[in-house]
């Protein structure tokens, strides 16, 4: 079987010499970018990591919007791992639980029904017992997704399509914040008040040259869910 150049072989099967420093650099960068893009760091356009985006998109596809009834969390997790996120169900459910906790998210993206844990560290009930649907504000993140507002790519096995980002009618990255540790990169953004952020966006739109000091008069500081 022919080997590619990245395998350290020529196409005729002969071993070729490579510079170990270059190979380490290229390999590390490829791995780092894979972790950054595919797992650990949120996209600035919608403020979501892939697992969170896939949860919201799967719920939207299942018609589990705010005005509809709650459905079993296990149904959602199965949809996510079966179509978009080929990883363990535990990781998906943990992300989903956090999205429903009003002490973890300033503006929860999931409306949970049942035991979703507590501030004191009590664990949530198993996914077969809890139910969920999209929160009202989550509908604003995915609103108009069917109107060519995003770019779709094939899922992991090419059987479905998924969005690379959600349209986002508000800056979720600033509103709900984000944290993540990747390879060679990390982020930790606190949440902010929605009204203040929108006022700040309007101010920047009206005056692109606005200073940080002027903007801080509008957005005075973080707004954590626990006060």
UniProtKB/Swiss-Prot annotation:
Reaction catalysed by this enzyme: ATP-dependent breakage, passage and rejoining of double-stranded DNA
UniProt gene name: gyrA
EC number: 5.6.2.2
Additional remark text: Few gyrases are as efficient as E.coli at forming negative supercoils. Not all organisms have 2 type II topoisomerases; in organisms with a single type II topoisomerase this enzyme also has to decatenate newly replicated chromosomes.
Family: Belongs to the type II topoisomerase GyrA/ParC subunit family.
One Gene Ontology biological process: DNA topological change
Protein name: DNA gyrase subunit A
Quaternary structure and interacting proteins, as annotated: Heterotetramer, composed of two GyrA and two GyrB chains. In the heterotetramer, GyrA contains the active site tyrosine that forms a transient covalent intermediate with DNA, while GyrB binds cofactors and catalyzes ATP hydrolysis.
Molecular functions (GO terms): ATP binding; DNA binding; DNA negative supercoiling activity
Function comment: A type II topoisomerase that negatively supercoils closed circular double-stranded (ds) DNA in an ATP-dependent manner to modulate DNA topology and maintain chromosomes in an underwound state. Negative supercoiling favors strand separation, and DNA replication, transcription, recombination and repair, all of which involve strand separation. Also able to catalyze the interconversion of other topological isomers of dsDNA rings, including catenanes and knotted rings. Type II topoisomerases break and join 2 DNA strands simultaneously in an ATP-dependent manner.
Keywords from the named record: ATP-binding, Cytoplasm, DNA-binding, Isomerase, Nucleotide-binding, Topoisomerase
One annotated Gene Ontology cellular component of this protein: DNA topoisomerase type II (double strand cut, ATP-hydrolyzing) complex
InterPro entries from the UniProt entry: Topo_IIA-like_dom_sf (IPR013760), Topo_IIA_A/C_ab (IPR013758), Topo_IIA_dom_A (IPR002205), Type_II_DNA_Topoisomerases (IPR050220)
Signal peptide: none
Enzyme class, UniProt record, top EC level: isomerase
List of catalytic residues: 129 (o-(5'-phospho-dna)-tyrosine intermediate)
Compartments where located: Cytoplasm
UniProt keyword Cytoplasm present: yes
Domain Topo IIA-type catalytic: 41-227
